[in-house]
Amino acid sequence: MTLLALLTLMQAMPLVPVPVPAAPPIARSPIDWAALPPLPYRRTPQPTTAMVNFVVTELRRNECPRPMPVKGRTQLQVDVAVLIGEDDLVRATIPRAIGCPTVEQYGAGLVVSFARGNLMPHFVNEGGWYRASLRFDWTE
């Protein structure tokens, strides 16, 4: 093919720009976590060793993002938004995304269990949303 034929062919074919894929939108939580009052426990629950071991195992097994250890200790906080019903029982939970759905759901389930019979009724508003925070702490 001659250069003239190649140039003629190129002129006949319009250049179509390749679309650049748009960056995915940054997911933002519709929950204002800082504005949620803490869930009013009678006795603040602490995760047991077995609970912590489960979280560590799930983080490894699912290749979830892990917090950086500080002086040989690692801490992971799981926040859960909690809706309390008129009977002072948990009606809904929404775990805060930490990049590990198994641990998020586990934390939400623990909050339901920890709240059962362990809330101060005179500090709970019917239909109110609260924040429960669980801290899993272990040695690397």
Regions found by a protein language model. Give the residues of each.
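Charge-biased low-complexity segments
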Residues: 2, 11-140
